[in-house]
Amino acid sequence: MKPIRLFSGVLILAVSTLAQDTKTAAVATAPQAQASQPAPTLASAIDREISDIEKQVLDAADAMPEDKFNFSPESLNLPGGNYKGVRTFAVQVKHIAASNYFIWSGITGDKLPDNLKDGNGPEDVKTKAEILKFLRNSFALGHKAAATLTPENMLQTPGHSKSTRLRLATFGVAHAFNHYGQMVEYLRMNGIVPPASRTKSD
């Protein structure tokens, strides 16, 4: 799926979520409204989308046994397949985290981790525990970025970026969803049902 379609889909989903939440809040009775959560905002709608993909990616990463973290489809030598040079599962996860930092730091202005040099993530982050920590920290930056969004600043282009704050926020989500789909295939190639797809019998 092309990045622009992913971005558009995430943006539509976020706007739909905000609209639905606003509609629900509007029809609540006065006592119910007082007892309910605060009215949704642009920031909370984007934050909800980040939370959704964060859970799926983290659960999928945690589901892969550590001894399979360096798995790549190239090792299967599938007939008719061409997986030469594709990322290992570990690097897929680190790529999501690295991209989260690169994308969302454009909104927050946070300094990148000293050991983050490229899109494949730090070379010294190797164990499953280290990779999951790196991943969690990258999503924490996403939540920080979402919290800064307002209707007034969402179309501003921060710093040296050519993209608006809103596009950066939603593109981070779209990019993570793209690579989550690849993580799912890696899990299934190893006989593991992704947590988000499991039933009670799994």
Feature annotation, model-predicted:
Residues 1-8:
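Bacterial N-terminal signal peptides that target proteins for export
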Residues 14-16:
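N-terminal signal peptide c-region/cleavage motif recognized by signal peptidases
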Residues 22-53:
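Short N-terminal segments immediately surrounding and downstream of signal-peptide cleavage
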Residues 31-42, 110-124:
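Acidic/histidine-rich, surface-exposed loop or edge segments in extracytoplasmic proteins
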Residues 47, 51-58, 70-119, 157-202:
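Short, contiguous alpha-helical
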Residues 49, 122-156, 164-177:
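Acidic/histidine-rich alpha-helical segments that form the ligand environment
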